[in-house]
């Protein structure tokens, strides 16, 4: 995680990198008490709490959310900053789908039945973006009425349903969610200079 932080500071352009913890997040957001109670009572895990946190921060301030485990190897593309919002999504036109399905068939699927079609660890957004605001509202309503999730990927599923059924015209440009996983896919492979080229 320390290496990831350094990469964000190096390649984050002029953005201020803010590292959040349980105390510092209170400086930026007023999280509803029912959410904090569910988190403290372990009815909500930190992964699902971070879904609320990322959307609330983007809704209120705009900017870029990156999970602490994101390793940047180059500067963030300016085109992502120019869009109203951007996140990596499943690309129907990807040529090497089979390779990705073989790598992780639970996450990477191009089946029409699959509702997990976006990556939430990197999200760009302008303040008060319609899609981000609606996703946040959906999550808040869900957690107000539930104590557990039916699927770990609830944010991704809600995004898919929102875009497919209501906000198709607001969908950001589709750039494959395999792209941010390229390095991780070969992380534990034996070093090969040919493969590097």
Predicted features and spans:
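Glycosyltransferase-associated regions of secretory-pathway enzymes
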Residues: 1-50, 68-197
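Small-residue hinge/turn detector
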Residues: 51-61
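Active-site acidic Asp-centered loop
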Residues: 61, 66-67
């Amino acid at each position: 995680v320390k290496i990831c932080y350094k990469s964000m500071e190096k390649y984050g352009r002029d953005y201020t990198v803010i590292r959040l913890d349980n105390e510092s997040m209170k400086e930026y957001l007023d999280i509803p008490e029912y959410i904090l109670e569910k988190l403290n009572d372990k009815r909500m895990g930190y992964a699902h709490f971070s879904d609320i946190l990322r959307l609330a921060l983007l809704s209120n301030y705009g900017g870029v959310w990156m999970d602490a485990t994101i390793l940047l190897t180059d500067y963030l593309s300016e085109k992502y900053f120019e869009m109203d919002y951007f996140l990596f999504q499943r690309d129907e036109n990807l040529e090497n789908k089979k390779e990705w399905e073989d790598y992780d068939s639970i996450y990477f699927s191009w089946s029409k039945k699959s509702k997990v079609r976006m990556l939430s660890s990197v999200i760009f957004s302008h303040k008060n973006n319609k899609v981000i605001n609606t996703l946040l509202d959906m999550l808040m309503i869900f957690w107000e009425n539930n104590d557990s999730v039916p699927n770990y990927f609830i944010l991704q599923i809600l995004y898919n349903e929102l875009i497919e059924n209501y906000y198709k015209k607001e969908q950001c440009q589709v750039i494959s969610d395999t792209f941010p996983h390229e390095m991780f896919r070969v992380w534990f492979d034996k070093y090969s200079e040919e493969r590097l080229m």
